[in-house]
């Protein structure tokens, strides 16, 4: 919204600053962070009052987790509120990619909210039907990908770009929309599964958002895209502002989610943030790079898939417990060790992902 002030720069020259993506990204980060930090205590108190027993804790999980009983969930509401307010304030309201990304984020957030609501009210780990949940996610992601395909440059519609290889594009044709929808749904559920320890998911999400904020900015600028020899995707630079807002909201949330957590993100936040990352990667034509940058999330969801498949096929478990962060807890790692070491992995993978921009 503030972007529109730049149109008055002919009369008031200082207003031209609102034209710059870098300035608005910084503004979005600060605004979202301040919003969550300021309203966080009130939201936590309200959720604690409404939820009573809070998020149910797995009885078969690590014994140390039993002390977390009574901690409220749905903290994703804090993140989404701060991020959305900031995004609406600082982005260009005429940008299609911003609205599509917001739709995915809020749609996935609504699904996660309902799932959290059922878990809290029933005091059970089972929300609503997994198949129905996936159906809703694919419906939202499919519609978003169809719009992204329409808004994409003519030469890049339905194309899958490969990192490192110059001008390497694979025309997926009609299959691109379901493929891209799978990327978004997969990202949403991968982040959702990662969110099992205090601070474990939110920091890698912020790292991934920072990385894709840079990627979106570079591929959305014709000069930098040409210099790096990557595909120029017009208007995606505005998604850097979205990433800035999410990072700010994430920092505000981390203040309250740092161990011992005062609130959990819940499916409300994790599903929404994962969907957001997937949507940005799809819009910027860097779907494969998302698997690198978000490699930690891939590892987490693959550990669950492997565990379930192995048990059904052989009756044996590969890991002591899945997702894999619980496996390391069962091996004797303390929760802070698991969290910080996984953060380190996330930073390394983000750097590798950024390096693919230069390697051509």
From Swiss-Prot:
Gene Ontology biological-process annotations: cell division; cell wall organization; peptidoglycan biosynthetic process; regulation of cell shape
Pfam families per the UniProt record, alphabetical: Glycos_transf_4, MraY_sig1
Pathway(s): Cell wall biogenesis; peptidoglycan biosynthesis
Topology term for the membrane: Multi-pass membrane protein
Record-annotated membrane-spanning stretches: 27-47, 70-90, 98-118, 134-154, 168-188, 199-219, 239-259, 263-283, 288-308, 337-357
PROSITE patterns linked: MRAY_1 (PS01347), MRAY_2 (PS01348)
Leading EC class: transferase
Catalytic activity: UDP-N-acetyl-alpha-D-muramoyl-L-alanyl-gamma-D-glutamyl-meso-2,6-diaminopimeloyl-D-alanyl-D-alanine + di-trans,octa-cis-undecaprenyl phosphate = di-trans,octa-cis-undecaprenyl diphospho-N-acetyl-alpha-D-muramoyl-L-alanyl-D-glutamyl-meso-2,6-diaminopimeloyl-D-alanyl-D-alanine + UMP
GO cellular component, one term: plasma membrane
InterPro entries, alphabetized: Glycosyl_transferase_4, PNAcMuramoyl-5peptid_Trfase, PNAcMuramoyl-5peptid_Trfase_CS
UniProt main location, coarse: membrane
Cofactor: Mg(2+)
GO molecular function list: metal ion binding; phospho-N-acetylmuramoyl-pentapeptide-transferase activity; UDP-N-acetylmuramoyl-L-alanyl-D-glutamyl-meso-2,6-diaminopimelyl-D-alanyl-D-alanine:undecaprenyl-phosphate transferase activity
Physiological role: Catalyzes the initial step of the lipid cycle reactions in the biosynthesis of the cell wall peptidoglycan: transfers peptidoglycan precursor phospho-MurNAc-pentapeptide from UDP-MurNAc-pentapeptide onto the lipid carrier undecaprenyl phosphate, yielding undecaprenyl-pyrophosphoryl-MurNAc-pentapeptide, known as lipid I.
Protein family membership: Belongs to the glycosyltransferase 4 family. MraY subfamily.
Protein name: Phospho-N-acetylmuramoyl-pentapeptide-transferase
Organism of origin: Methylorubrum populi (strain ATCC BAA-705 / NCIMB 13946 / BJ001) (Methylobacterium populi)
């Amino acid at each position: 919204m503030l972007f529109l002030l730049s149109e008055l720069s002919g009369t008031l020259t200082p207003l031209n600053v609102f034209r710059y993506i870098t300035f608005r990204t910084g503004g979005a980060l600060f605004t979202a962070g301040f919003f969550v930090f300021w309203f966080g205590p009130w939201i936590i108190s309200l959720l604690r009052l409404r939820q009573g027993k809070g998020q149910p804790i797995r009885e078969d999980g690590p014994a140390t987790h039993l002390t977390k009983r009574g901690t409220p969930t749905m903290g994703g509401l804090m993140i989404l509120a701060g991020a959305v307010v900031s995004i609406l304030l600082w982005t260009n309201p005429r940008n299609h990619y911003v609205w599509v990304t917001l739709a995915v984020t809020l749609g996935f957030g609504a699904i996660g909210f309902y799932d959290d609501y059922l878990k809290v009210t029933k005091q059970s780990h089972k929300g609503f039907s997994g198949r129905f949940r996936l159906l809703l996610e694919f419906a939202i992601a499919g519609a978003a990908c169809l719009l992204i395909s329409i808004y994409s440059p003519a030469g890049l519609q339905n194309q899958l770009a490969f990192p490192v290889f110059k001008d390497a594009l694979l025309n997926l044709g009609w299959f691109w929309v379901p493929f891209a929808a799978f990327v978004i749904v997969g990202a949403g559920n991968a982040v959702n599964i990662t969110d099992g320890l205090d601070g474990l998911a939110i920091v890698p999400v912020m790292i991934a958002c920072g990385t894709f904020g840079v990627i979106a900015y570079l591929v959305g600028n014709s000069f930098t895209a040409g210099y790096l020899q990557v595909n120029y995707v017009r208007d995606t630079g505005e998604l850097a502002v979205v990433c800035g807002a999410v990072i700010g909201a994430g920092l505000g949330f981390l203040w309250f989610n740092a161990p011992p957590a005062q609130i959990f993100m819940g499916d409300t936040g994790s599903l929404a943030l994962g969907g957001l990352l997937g949507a940005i990667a799809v819009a910027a034509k860097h779907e494969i790079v998302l698997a690198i940058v978000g490699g930690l999330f891939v590892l987490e969801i693959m550990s669950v898939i492997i565990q379930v498949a192995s048990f059904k096929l052989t009756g044996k478990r590969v890991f002591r417990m899945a997702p894999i962060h619980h496996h390391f807890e069962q091996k004797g790692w303390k929760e802070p060790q698991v969290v910080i070491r996984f953060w380190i992995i996330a930073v390394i993978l983000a750097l590798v992902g950024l390096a693919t921009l230069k390697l051509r």
